[in-house]
A protein has these predicted regions:
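A structured beta-alpha segment of the ubiquitous adenosine-cofactor-binding alpha/beta core
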Residues: 1-7, 17-18, 165-197, 201-218
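Solvent-exposed alpha-helices and their adjacent loops that cap or buttress functional pockets
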Residues: 4-6, 25-28, 104-108, 127, ...
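Short glycine-/small-residue-rich Rossmann-like dinucleotide-binding loops
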Residues: 10, 16-17, 37-38, 202-203, ...
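Glycine/serine-rich phosphate-binding loop and adjoining beta1-alpha1 elements at the start
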Residues: 24-111
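Rossmann-fold NAD(P)-binding glycine/threonine-rich loop
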Residues: 39-68, 206-250
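Generic hydrophobic/aromatic pocket-lining and core-packing "Φ" positions
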Residues: 46, 86, 124-125, 145, ...
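Glycine-rich phosphate/diphosphate-binding loop of Rossmann-like nucleotide-binding domains
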Residues: 98-190
């Protein structure tokens, strides 16, 4: 029985989810739980663990420095998420990804837009390119343009002369309202012609920014696929529901 095993456990490892109520009630005091629990968003759930006198080590708060690199679970999970997002999109997409030249004619390659060029985004770019897509990417950090282009993708530029965010960072940060308007216009212009959109943009401790609006979705081609990896933080796509597949008749 799972609960009997939990009752005898001293250290419990979890990947992405906080142990449910039954597990918490079955565990003994001073249990050590290690995993990624997003404490910014799950404060109440973590308080219930503290009430039970359970010790929680949330590895997503580890500093992203070289000494802690071997324990950087965020990067390893994001890497897998970026890869899986493209594979999932290819399964849902009704056509082939690469260009195919046959006796019956030529099939043009699928167009893929990656929003957010962090660890997940860069892996999504690399995977989509390997599968034969024409890839375009966007990120609020202009310094990642070189990384995006090194993977063979195009980079969408937004004039950020009025932005207060200039320094190098591994995380995206809050932008000015004026920048957000320019950003949405650029993304809308590119996204409506795409076959695949994968969104990965998140801001630590805050709700994920809406990058793909309803009007953009309505103008996209029939059969297009959006995979939103920011669902746990509210999503980058307007109207999305975390963990659910939604079919929109546009």
């Amino acid at each position: 029985n799972k609960l009997d095993i939990i009752n005898q456990t001293d250290i419990l490892l979890s990947v992405t989810s906080i142990p449910d109520k039954k597990i918490i009630e079955s565990s003994k005091e001073n249990l050590i739980v290690v995993g990624t629990f997003n404490p910014y968003e799950n404060k109440k759930s973590l308080q219930s663990l503290a009430f039970k006198k359970i010790n929680v080590l949330s590895l997503d708060l580890l500093p992203r420095i070289s000494r802690a690199q071997s324990m950087d679970v965020l990067s390893s999970q994001a890497n897998l998420a970026g890869y899986k997002a493209v594979i999932l999109a290819s399964n849902l997409f009704r056509k082939a990804f690469p260009m195919m030249m046959t006796a019956a004619g030529t099939i043009i390659p699928a167009k893929c837009l990656i929003l957010g060029a962090g660890v997940a985004g860069l892996q999504a770019i690399a995977t989509a390119k390997r599968l034969g897509c024409v890839v375009t990417a966007f990120d609020v950090r202009p310094e990642v343009e070189e990384q995006v282009k090194s993977l063979g993708a195009k980079f969408i530029k937004v004039d950020d002369s009025d932005s207060t965010v200039k320094e190098n960072s591994v995380y995206a940060k809050e932008m000015t309202e004026e920048y957000k308007l320019k950003q949405k216009a650029k993304i809308h212009e590119s996204a409506k012609d795409m076959d695949i959109i994968i969104t990965t943009a998140m801001i630590p401790g805050k709700k994920a920014p809406i990058l793909v609006e309803s009007k953009t979705i309505r103008e996209m081609k029939l059969g297009s696929v959006i995979v939103d990896l920011a669902g746990s933080s509210g999503g980058n796509t307007e109207g999305m529901k975390s963990g659910e597949e939604i079919i929109i008749d546009n």
